[in-house]
Each structure stands twice: as structure tokens, then as C-alpha cells.
């Protein structure tokens, strides 16, 4: 077992009850284009077209054959684009349940499928896009092979669902998914889980089970990769979400695209935080109707640390998100707030009284408690960075745009979510995730 000592479990109120309930009926779903790093779409449908679930909506121009398929049947009600015609979302108004049938196999023959058969099947169904590379967090290029594949069967994000509760409902499909993923690599398939969780029921020479314990980010796949299979420009691994492993298992045994999603709906502004069964790309406004406290709320697809805020074109459950978080918009001004003791304010340093209440949960809002200022190295970053990385030096080089030094200090191992805690504890209020993405893009372009 690998024990993580550095990190932070955010003391936020509104943790969900780990019981799965049926979510509300969803009438609109969407595929969000900006979730796929570097993707350039070639549209195969137009607004007003009627599509089946599993039908291709667009193809990646940079990687021919990588199809992005509809998560539901119905009418394409909107294709939203942003600046420079960047694809933001393809919205589908759900109508019926017609779907594209896919080939399926006997359970006993799954471990005999070739790499080419598996890739072809995943590409046609759109489930290939559930895979992401490290470094760069991009959809893998067809016909490539990773050194290893990672599945994170644990989640230490604030307000997260317990993956064990979800995997237990589809354990057979999860095991079938592991069999399929093992066909894509000659290396290991690493299943990372918390201590005491019974996910190690499937025996395969390539599948290994690894226990991680400790505070967040002990559950992030970037942490697992760092300790088990560190990556570089010459070494690539893939990772995939545990619910997508279930979907892959069902695709190959049933021949249909499984688009169910069990998500945590939680946060200080949720009336009854719980796990909801919904569908991939579900409308967040429909998902949260009647479940929020009154007030000016911010709905977030994903974690409060690294998720995507609700907007007109992005108001849908993200492809890689397992939770919906809701916090209050912090628009109020506080007179002389800087001299108040701060009993209801949390800080990782001893600057507020709330720091000393070790078991108190806080109703966090979007208030940043100050504006941008100089980056001050007072040890905050090192407290929450468990990786073998010089955090302050790396963050400084990211802000300076020094690609060579940032790469030497380990930025290739990171994704935006790996620096979310550094953003949270930063006295200078810097957003390190977007800066990291810019540096990674430059490194990739420069080769």
C-alpha cells in the first residue's frame, strides 16, 4: 500500500449519502467538444438532424477514425461554437430510445480478441474517446499502444461518490471491461483503490491491484501514475474512468452503448446530497431542479476544485465527471473582513479562526477572499503536493512560460486537476490549471 501524507481533504459541508437514487427524467443531453484536448471536429450532422444513440456526430480531423457518438437518440437541437468557431457543445433533444447495434461477443472469448478488433470496436462506438493519454491528457491516436493502463477505482475529490458503491452494482461488466483493456497493452492494467475495498475480484496476469491511502489527491490518477509508472515524452500510459470500464464491458458483451452515469449531487447548497442515476451528458438544470437551496448558486460539473461552471453552452454533465457540485455565489461584500477573526472561514494557514476547528465543515462559496497579487512562496504548495516535485519552482516556471525548466521539473506528469489544490491554497489567487495546459501545448508543438 502506498500512503500519501501530503494533501488536503477539503472540509466542505454537504457530503452525499452513499445511496443510489433514480434521477429525474432528462430531456436534453450534450457532447462537450472542449473536453477533448486538441480535437478538431469534422461535423457529420447538422442542427435539426435526427440521430440514434451511438451514431457518429463528428470525427476528429487530426485523428481520422476517432468518432464522437451520440449519447442518446433524438434531434440535434443546437451546435454551439465559440471564438474562432471552436466547438463547445452538440445538444440533443431526447426522443425515443433507438440505438445503433454493435457486434457483441461471448464472455468466454473476450480474452481471445486481438488488439485490432478491440480498437476497431471502441472507435466505432465512440468509447475510444473515454481513454486519455498521460502526458498531455489527449484521446489516444488509433493503432498506438500504451506502456500501461490505469483505472482509478477510488475518489478523494471533495463531495465525491464512493466508486465501490457504483462498481458493486455492475461488478461483472467491470471485470469484462478489464479483460478488454488488457488486450490494448502488453503492460499492466493498474486498478487503484482505497484500503479495504473489495475490487480485487478479477484475476488476470496483466491486472494488478494497488492500494492508496491518505488525503486528496491520493485518489487522482496522476498520483497513481507518478508512483507506479512515471511518464515522459518517450513513455505514454492511458487512463480511463471506472464507469467507462463498465460501459466497455457492456459494449462487448451486449453490443449496445451504455450511457448511464451515477453521479454525486452534493455541496452546501444541495437540500439532500445523494447519488443519482442519470445519463451521460445530462442537462445540469434538469438534474438539479427542485434539489437546491434558494439563493444565487453556482452549479459545477465535476469537483469544486477543478470542475466546469454551468453556462448556457456548457450546462451539461461532462464526459469525465462523476459528480455535480453546488456552492453559493460569493457576491456579498464584507466590511473590514480582513480584520475579522474568520470563525466561518477556512484557511490552510493560521490566518483565520476557522483554521483551528479541525472537525468543522464549512459552507464554501465562490468568494476568493481577495484579488490577484504576487506569488508568495510560504510553503502552502508543498503542504498539498505529495508528488516528488519541487512545487514552488515548477509553478513559478509555469507562470514564467519556461517550457524547458517546467518539463525538467515534472510538468509532463500533470493534468489540470493535479494542480487544483495548489490553486486553492495560493495566496496570489493564480489559476495554475490553464497555465499548465498552455505549457503542455507548447511542449507538444515543439516536440
Swiss-Prot record:
Pfam families noted in UniProt: NQRA_2nd, NQRA_N, NQRA_SLBB
E.C. number: 7.2.1.1
GO biological process annotation, one example: sodium ion transport
EC supergroup of this enzyme: translocase
Family of this protein: Belongs to the NqrA family.
PANTHER family named in the record: NA(+)-TRANSLOCATING NADH-QUINONE REDUCTASE SUBUNIT A (PTHR37839:SF1)
Protein name: Na(+)-translocating NADH-quinone reductase subunit A
Amino acid at each position: 500500500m502506498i500512503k500519501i501524507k501530503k494533501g488536503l481533504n477539503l472540509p466542505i459541508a454537504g457530503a452525499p449519502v452513499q445511496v443510489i437514487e433514480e434521477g429525474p427524467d432528462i430531456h436534453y443531453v450534450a457532447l462537450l467538444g472542449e473536453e477533448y484536448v486538441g480535437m478538431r471536429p469534422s461535423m457529420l450532422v447538422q442542427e435539426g438532424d435526427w440521430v440514434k444513440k451511438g451514431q457518429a456526430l463528428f470525427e476528429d480531423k487530426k485523428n481520422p477514425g476517432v468518432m464522437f457518438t451520440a449519447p442518446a437518440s433524438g434531434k440535434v437541437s443546437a451546435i454551439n461554437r465559440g471564438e474562432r468557431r471552436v466547438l463547445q457543445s452538440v445538444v440533443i433533444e431526447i426522443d425515443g430510445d433507438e440505438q445503433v447495434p454493435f457486434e457483441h461477443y461471448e464472455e468466454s472469448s473476450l480474452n481471445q480478441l486481438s488488439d485490432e478488433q478491440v480498437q476497431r470496436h471502441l472507435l466505432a462506438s465512440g468509447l475510444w474517446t473515454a481513454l486519455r493519454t498521460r502526458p498531455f491528457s489527449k484521446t489516444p491516436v488509433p493503432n498506438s499502444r500504451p506502456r500501461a493502463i490505469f483505472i482509478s477505482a477510488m475518489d478523494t475529490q471533495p463531495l465525491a461518490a464512493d466508486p465501490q458503491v457504483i462498481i458493486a452494482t455492475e461488478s461483472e461488466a467491470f471485470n469484462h471491461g478489464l479483460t478488454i483493456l488488457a488486450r490494448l497493452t502488453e503492460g499492466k492494467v493498474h486498478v487503484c483503490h482505497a484500503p479495504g475495498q473489495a475490487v480485487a475480484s478479477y484475476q488476470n496476469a496483466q491486472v494488478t491491484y494497488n492500494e492508496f491511502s491518505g488525503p486528496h489527491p491520493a485518489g487522482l490518477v496522476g498520483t497513481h501514475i507518478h508512483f507506479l509508472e512515471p511518464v515522459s515524452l518517450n513513455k505514454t500510459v492511458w487512463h480511463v474512468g471506472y464507469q467507462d470500464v463498465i460501459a466497455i464491458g457492456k459494449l462487448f458483451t451486449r453490443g449496445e452503448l451504455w450511457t448511464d452515469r451515477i453521479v454525486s449531487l452534493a455541496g452546501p447548497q444541495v437540500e439532500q446530497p445523494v447519488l443519482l442515476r442519470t445519463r451521460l451528458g445530462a442537462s445540469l438544470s434538469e438534474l438539479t431542479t427542485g434539489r437546491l437551496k434558494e439563493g444565487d448558486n453556482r452549479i459545477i460539473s465535476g469537483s469544486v476544485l477543478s470542475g466546469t461552471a454551468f453556462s448556457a453552452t456548457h450546462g451539461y454533465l461532462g464526459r469525465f465527471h462523476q459528480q455535480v457540485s453546488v456552492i453559493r455565489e460569493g457576491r456579498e461584500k464584507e466590511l473590514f473582513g480582513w480584520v475579522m477573526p474568520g470563525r466561518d472561514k477556512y484557511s490552510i494557514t493560521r490566518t483565520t479562526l476557522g483554521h483551528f476547528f479541525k472537525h468543522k465543515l464549512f459552507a464554501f462559496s465562490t468568494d476568493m477572499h481577495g484579488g490577484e497579487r504576487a506569488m508568495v512562496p510560504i510553503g502552502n504548495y508543498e503542504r498539498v503536493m505529495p508528488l516528488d516535485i519541487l512545487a514552488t519552482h515548477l509553478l513559478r516556471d509555469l507562470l514564467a512560460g519556461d517550457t524547458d525548466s517546467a518539463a525538467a521539473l515534472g510538468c509532463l506528469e500533470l493534468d489540470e486537476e493535479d494542480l487544483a489544490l495548489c490553486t486553492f491554497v495560493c495566496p496570489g489567487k493564480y489559476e495554475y490549471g490553464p497555465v499548465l495546459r498552455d505549457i503542455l501545448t507548447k511542449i507538444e508543438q515543439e516536440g
